[in-house]
Structure formats: structure tokens, C-alpha cells
Amino acid sequence: MADPWQECMDYAVTLARQAGEVVCEAIKNEMNVMLKSSPVDLVTATDQKVEKMLISSIKEKYPSHSFIGEESVAAGEKSILTDNPTWIIDPIDGTTNFVHRFPFVAVSIGFAVNKKIEFGVVYSCVEGKMYTARKGKGAFCNGQKLQVSQQEDITKSLLVTELGSSRTPETVRIVLSNMEKLFCIPVHGIRSVGTAAVNMCLVATGGADAYYEMGIHCWDVAGAGIIVTEAGGVLMDVTGGPFDLMSRRVIAANNRILAERIAKEIQVIPLQRDDED
């Protein structure tokens, strides 16, 4: 039987590449930076332009499909995930990197049907790396099959996380305390690339063993989550329970052993869900 969503995935790859070209061209120029929820939650005209370009192109081809887009939500639309085929889009994951020309920025597209992710596309455009995964078909980077690492010993692991965009003292205290706890186990190291999608793709490649973060949004992880699982990894909630796309928290790891150990060590930050008003 033909794959009903393969055409959508092929189109997503084409659009991500086109969007990446726009982003890479714009990164060379001076940009007008605006603020969203805080002085460090940044948005540029390119974020907005790329999202509009992606959504209008998809709407034209698939008029019955739904959308959740980072900049649409910032403009007042709701993050409601229904059973309808839904494109979950982050036009520039790593906007702060983009503003500073730090070369890790990604176009991220996740596609859900019946609230389950069917495929993910993450284009790390400055690097020229196209990460893709289709449910049940494996994960790839530029056509090369991906496989997570086999490391089960946390003391020999390399972790990835982010400090996040919150500057609330209590949140910052928990973020730093969690890093300190993990760092002193000890782990081999903790890295931050500045984009959740690329961090997760690094777990899929085996370059990092696990990634965790609280405060991310569904559009940060919808594309990359399936890339991790199709490369043999696991997604988990930071409490150790099942991963929930709308919960704003995630552990993406090479295996359950590392994921559960990280969940055991970290304090949970209370957050409003993406699908709450």
C-alpha cells in the first residue's frame, strides 16, 4: 500500500530547503530584532517571513490541513493539536543564534495525524544538514542512516541542554542546580548548541547521548523527536513518565537507562502547557 503521507514529507523537505536558503541569505545582513515574552525571547522579520512562506505554500497544496506555528502563536493563535493532519512549524529554531550569526539555526517541521507524529524534518541550514525521519522507516542525515550511541553508563555520557529564555531567578536557580547535579555525577560533559531541534538531532547521530530541557515548546521538538526515536532513541517526560508533546519538557536519550537516570536527578520546573490558555 502506498504511504499516504510520503508526498507530504517530500514536500516538507523541499520547503525546509527553500526556507533554509532564505535564512542563510538573511543571516548575512543586519536584522531588526523584536522581543516576545522577555528581553531574551527574540523574533526577527525573517522568522515571520519564513513561517508565512511555509504555511501559505502548504495551505495551497493541502487546504484541509491544520497548523501550529511559533510566530502564529506569538501573534495570538492557539496551540491546539487535533486529530486532523497538522503541520507543527518552527521557522527558525535558534533565533538568538541567528541574530548573533552563531551558526546553528534550523527550520523544523513536524507532521502529526491523530495527535501522533508521522514524520519530522529538521534542516540545519548553515551546516547544510537535512535531518529526516518517517515513522517506521528510520532516521537520516543527508541520506545517511542515523543510529544513537550505545552508551548506558551516565559517567561516560555527553549530555546536551539549554539554559532557556526564562530569567526568573527561581527558574534559573533550578536550571543551574539541575546542571550541577548531573555535571557532578560526573558526566563527561554538558553542551549547548542553542537550538532544541539540533540538540535532539545530535542525540540521533550518536554525537550526544542525551538531551533534556524544560521550557521548550511543541514546535521546538515536533520535528526532531521522531528523528531521535527512528534512530533507536527514546523520548520521555522529565518526571520519568511518557513524553507529551504539549507539556513543554522532554528527555531525548539513546536509551531508557540514561533517560531514567536523568529524570531521577532533575527537579521539575512548573510550566504552563502549550495547549492551555
From Swiss-Prot:
Regulation: Inhibited by Li(+), Ca(2+) and Mn(2+), but also by Mg(2+) at concentrations above 3 mM.
Source species of the chain: Pongo abelii (Sumatran orangutan)
Binding site for substrate: 70, 92-95, 194-196, 213, 220
GO molecular function: fructose-1-phosphatase activity; glucose-1-phosphatase activity; glucose-6-phosphatase activity; glycerol-2-phosphatase activity; inositol monophosphate 1-phosphatase activity; inositol monophosphate 3-phosphatase activity; inositol monophosphate 4-phosphatase activity; inositol monophosphate phosphatase activity
Pathway entry: Polyol metabolism; myo-inositol biosynthesis; myo-inositol from D-glucose 6-phosphate: step 2/2
Transmembrane segments: none
GO cellular component: cytoplasm
Binding residues annotated for Mg(2+) 2, in chain numbering: 90, 93, 220
Annotated binding of Mg(2+) 1, by residue: 70, 90, 92
Name of the featured protein: Inositol monophosphatase 1
Gene3D superfamilies noted in UniProt: 3.40.190.80, Fructose-1,6-Bisphosphatase, subunit A, domain 1
GO BP field: inositol biosynthetic process; phosphatidylinositol phosphate biosynthetic process; signal transduction
Domain of life: Eukaryota
Transmembrane found in the keyword field: no
Cofactor(s) named in the record: Mg(2+)
